[in-house]
Amino acid sequence: MAVALNIADLAEHAIDAVPDRVAVICGDEQLTYAQLEDKANRLAHHLIDQGVQKDDKVGLYCRNRIEIVIAMLGIVKAGAILVNVNFRYVEGELRYLFDNSDMVALVHERRYADRVANVLPDTPHVRTILVVEDGSDQDYRRYGGVEFYSAIAAGSPERDFGERSADAIYLLYTGGTTGFPKGVMWRHEDIYRVLFGGTDFATGEFVKDEYDLAKAAAANPPMIRYPIPPMIHGATQSATWMALFSGQTTVLAPEFNADEVWRTIHKHKVNLLFFTGDAMARPLVDALVKGNDYDLSSLFLLASTAALFSPSIKEKLLELLPNRVITDSIGSSETGFGGTSVVAAGQAHGGGPRVRIDHRTVVLDDDGNEVKPGSGVRGVIAKKGNIPVGY
């Protein structure tokens, strides 16, 4: 059977390469790649049995936890399209997102049941609802919600979903901070190349073979990645998919607590930490300054994306954590990574990240035509190649 650069296929290559390796950790819970495969297959079959069809939209309304990774993989295995739902949205924003995305199914944490109950009467196309228990007691049965693990238990564990396409759509909703959220539509192959590890970020060269990441996983011990931002953030989706494709281990936590971050790094021997600028870096610095007995020697990379990351905070982190590397990246839901700066102890500070100029960079005039070098015509910088297909 022909295999394309499809997200589900890429994850399955790693699952086959390292089935007994730990895929995801949250608190005291963890799943191996084989266990993740079993549960994701069951979820995919449950969704299909409930009438979810190829390219249907399935909302994911959860904080970072193991079930969110099961759901992400299960949704793409079913051929459906994931809709990232911001758990901070109020009912008006939820109503807009449910309607705008044409969502037909929803996976949500129980703590959001009251909001969901108030929105569903206006969004009757949302017909299948799975609820992840989180210790809260809101009533979800009033609108036909079914407990997550009970629902998927009856689903088949088999991987029998047929041929997939690189042209399948991955939908990445913007945060909606400057207006209504927009669903950025990426082909699976394109977002893999731009955000999910299909391009070497250092050289700009494509990963040549779809099995390369899985082969490397089998040949090397896993890196432990800890993305702090919520999964509604494209950066954490990126970090999680990259880890899954390459057989690495992802550590998640439902809430941000700076002291708990360092404790988690100590406990799980985290190698790569992902966060969003000063909003997270300042509390992390403050927690370190207070002092602790944590062994942080496993940590070698701290990566910030999509938010202001002040030079003074970078320098303080390097002072507290010498011999580490810090990266600061810019980008968006529409572009992926736009540029990265690297800071390390003993090196000259190069300032913030700058847009990378390479073979995918063009200048467009006011009519959208590509400007020829040396013509003297002014325009705007744009990116070509692996880009979204629209909103």
Task: Describe the role of every protein-language-model region.
Residues 1-5, 137-168:
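Flexible, low-complexity linker/hinge segments
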Residues 3, 12, 20-65, 69-73, ...:
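Conserved AMP-binding/adenylate-forming core of the ANL superfamily
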Residues 19, 155-173, 180, 215-224:
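Conserved pre-ATP/AMP-binding loop-to-beta segment of ANL
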Residues 32-34, 169-205:
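Conserved AMP-binding A3 loop
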Residues 36, 248, 266, 289, ...:
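Conserved AMP-binding/adenylate-forming
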Residues 49-50, 77-150:
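Structural core segment of the AMP-binding/adenylate-forming
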Residues 63, 108-117, 135, 229, ...:
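Adenylate-forming
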Residues 192-228, 232-272, 287:
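Conserved AMP-binding/adenylation subdomain of ANL enzymes
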